[in-house]
Amino acid sequence: KESSAKKFQRQHIDSSGSPSTNPNYCNAMMKSRNMTQERCKPVNTFVHEPLADVQAVCFQKNVPCKNGQSNCYESTSNMHITDCRLTSNSKFPDCLYRTSQEEKSIIVACEGNPYVPVHFDASVAASA
């Protein structure tokens, strides 16, 4: 079974892909990373930074998670990310996404030993 840490990498890490202006990026990536198999995942964020940099966020700024848990961490620097949002006229299995490039801090939930990201909680405009 896929571990939470591996699932996080599959769903959110695209270190090789530089943030692309390709409008089809999300359509292609959501499919190739298996997020459109049983249904169209409505929203997903890809992070275009080295895995080690994303894992390091677990030791940065501790913040509360959206669900109230206390194991979330905000990156102390901006990261290049791509937000994928399902378009309103999408019908499974034809999942169509809007691709938007951003530079923001990311918030991830971490657990385990080694302590690694297992859930992407949010992205926020970096605090200046």
UniProtKB/Swiss-Prot annotation:
Its EC number is 4.6.1.18. This is Ribonuclease pancreatic. GO terms for molecular function: lyase activity; nucleic acid binding; ribonuclease A activity. The keyword tRNA processing does not apply. One of its GO terms (biological process) is defense response to Gram-positive bacterium. Glycans are attached at N34. The active site is at H12, H119. Endonuclease that catalyzes the cleavage of RNA on the 3' side of pyrimidine nucleotides. Acts on single-stranded and double-stranded RNA. Monomer. Interacts with and forms tight 1:1 complexes with RNH1. Dimerization of two such complexes may occur. Interaction with RNH1 inhibits this protein. Disulfide bonds join C26-C84, C40-C95, C58-C110, C65-C72. It holds the Pfam family RnaseA. Pancreas. SMART domains: RNAse_Pc (SM00092). Coiled coil: none annotated. Substrate binds at K7, R10, K41, P42, V43, N44, T45, K66, R85.
